[in-house]
Amino acid sequence: MQLNIIGAGLAGCEAALWLADRGVQVDLYEQKPTKFSPAHKSEGFAELICSNSLKAERPDSASGLLKIEMKMMGSHLLDAAETARVAAGGALAVDRDVFSTAVTEMVEKHPNITVHREEVTALDESAPVLVASGPLTEGALAQAVAALTGDHRLSFYDAVAPIVTAESLDYDKVFAASRYGRGEADYLNCPFNKEEYENFHAALIAAERAPLHDFDGDLTVYEGCMPIEVMAARGADTIRFGPLRPVGLRDPRTGHRPWAAVQLRAENTARTLYNLVGFQTNLKWGEQKRVFSMIPGLEHAEFVRYGVMHRNTFLESPKVLTKQQFLADHPNVFFAGQITGFEGYMESAASGLLAAHQILARLQGCELPPPPAATMCGALLDYITTPNKDFQPMGANMGILPRTEEINTIRDKRERYMALSQNAQDAMCAWTEEYK
């Protein structure tokens, strides 16, 4: 059995090591040092760019649960992370250089992995191939991917609004309605009075913005969508006549039209997550929490994702990718990592593990169902392959896990999350036992 893997990032290395352990002859292609992306600096594999934190380890946290599931699936990168661990309280943080060196050595010393330090410019569909080229995929490879998926199915920039959990909203203030009462009440609305709006506007235009990385470039040229803080700076009423326009809405508390209103749109079919419509932003994350918590009804909102605007090459996965992580119209071409819409270091590595399981099944002539949606891995996979007219990448969070009626009755948040985590662990344990 033989497989080509393109990209020696977290997803590619995780997949390569897992498959090689099971007798697959892996040819791993990495363009460094022949060619560097604008973000990468070292020749090592699994290079961490923006942070050395691999997030929380608590089992009642989304990140902690994800790591538990990855261990059940046979993660090698978590072993490497342990050797590179640095003190970080309840989080798993690593020395980036030590981590990258550990992963590189694991890969280069494995007898079933052959490393090719060269750029890949075309995709050979004659046999299974795994594309794990990352969020900065560009040039000939990006063109090759676009040729298979269609140019309109490959995005090159993220402009994402914040996402909050439904259970953290204040429904004494937030109300469901569509403008003018047309159709179903598909939106949740957060109504401002004049004073609330003016205070929010002042805080928004004064908030500190995140610096763009060199590789992000001028995003507005490509996005055609303006950050909410930039729009607000144009005038006191600009956003009130834009994304915060209150026309067609009536606040049930007052019986009148609000001065302004933020609309929340469901992010998933279970309606456990909502995004802030029109709130693409480049504010620092701490500022987003501070300023957006001034929105009526969001005072205690739990943000599962903050808004970002950055360079990010990713597939419109719900339109092109199966739950087995291959292209629906090109079944020998598998994808893993951030290019699929898995957002985050550990999420990327997890998607590599998931793809590896599917590829081994293919090479053995078997079919493998994905992990149950009750698991964090299964929920993420379900998210990126479920139709969504405004698809954006997603990281691990408790909001994407399905809830049972019993879990919904648990009032304490930490206990509720622990119950979700235990359900997920049980489901992943059963899946790995059945399909190991």
Task: Label every model-predicted segment.
Residues 3, 24-26, 129, 154:
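Hydrophobic anchor at the start of a short beta-strand
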Residues 1-11:
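Beta1/beta-strand and adjacent pyrophosphate-binding region of the FAD-binding site
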Residues 276-342, 349-351, 369-386, 391-397, ...:
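A glycine-rich dinucleotide-binding beta-alpha-beta segment and adjacent secondary-structure elements
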Residues 57-104, 108:
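A conserved beta-strand/loop capping segment in the N-terminal third of enzymes
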Residues 348-370:
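Internal hydrophobic alpha-helix adjacent to the cofactor/substrate pocket in enzyme cavities
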Residues 17-79, 373-384:
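N-terminal FAD cofactor-binding segment of flavoenzymes
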Residues 109-290:
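Predominantly flavin-linked oxidoreductase catalytic cores and closely associated redox partners
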Residues 391-436:
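C-terminal auxiliary extensions adjacent to catalytic cores
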